[in-house]
Design a protein with these regions (language model features):
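Catalytic beta/alpha-barrel core
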Residues: 1-9, 32-34, 61
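Charged, low-complexity, helix/coiled-coil-prone segments
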Residues: 2-12, 169-178
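Active-site glycine- and acidic-residue-rich loops that bind
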Residues: 4-21, 95
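Structural recognition of alpha->loop->beta junctions
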Residues: 20-31, 108
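Conserved active-site-proximal phosphate/metal-binding subdomains
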Residues: 28, 38-90, 96-223
Length: 223
């Protein structure tokens, strides 16, 4: 089993690697740094995400996170040296084109993780209606949303999420016991049910996770 933590901040990387080092005398095999433009659940507070979102300039957003990336890499390097091994670092979040990939590698990372760009491809096995939701989305449709897991997420606004953001509670049809500590009678909606709707292409009832650049998709392409 490999240890591959996903972190967004220097503090998170330091705590995780220190814990594994002290308790298990092990370190990570790989570290993924997920930036503020990623899709799905995000390792930032809503306030931090809104601060990044205040700037529409893509270059600014990238550079404003560069210092954090370098700090995380320094933490990883410390444990790489201690254990005498290579710990590859992969950068994710907002890497949509060649320029973004080039910028990521200029920071010294070993690899990149790309998701949103590949959703609207023939090779992606997502339901066609899910892909079409990306293609139809405008920049303004992509918002930071509520999630039952207690973390902010990035998704496409649709009838389902409009109800949630308006304060409506959508009761789970059946509790699947998917999350420890979850209280079905209190959560705004069931994360599993909403993601299953997305997988089935039932986009009006789904949580449509996406990266910040999903609106840039114009058509179904091929890899």
């Amino acid at each position: 089993t490999t240890l591959e933590p996903i972190v967004s901040k220097e503090g998170s990387a330091a705590v995780i690697l220190k814990y594994w080092d002290r308790k298990y005398h092990r370190t990570a095999d790989l570290v993924v740094i997920e930036g503020p433009k990623a899709g799905g659940h995000l390792g930032f507070s809503r306030e931090q995400l809104e601060e990044y979102a205040e700037y529409d300039d893509k270059e600014y957003t990238e550079k404003s996170y560069d210092d954090e990336v370098k700090k995380i890499m320094a933490v990883v390097r410390k444990y790489s040296e201690k254990y005498g091994c290579s710990i590859p670092v992969v950068l994710a979040g907002g890497i949509y084109d060649r320029a973004a990939a080039k910028h990521a590698f200029s920071l010294g990372v070993d690899g990149i993780q790309v998701a949103t760009r590949f959703v609207t491809t023939e090779e992606c096995d997502a339901d066609i209606r899910y892909k079409e939701a990306y293609i139809r989305a405008n920049k303004e449709d992509i918002q930071i949303v509520k999630s039952p897991v207690g973390m902010p997420g990035r998704a496409i606004m649709n009838p389902f999420m409009e109800r949630v953001m308006a304060g409506e509670r959508i009761s789970p049809k059946k509790c699947l016991l998917c999350m420890k500590g979850c209280k079905p009678s209190e959560i705004p909606y069931c994360i599993t049910e909403s993601l299953l709707h997305a997988a089935k292409g039932e986009t009006d009832e789904a949580l449509l996770f996406c990266g910040a650049d999903a609106w840039r998709a114009e058509k179904i392409e091929t890899v």
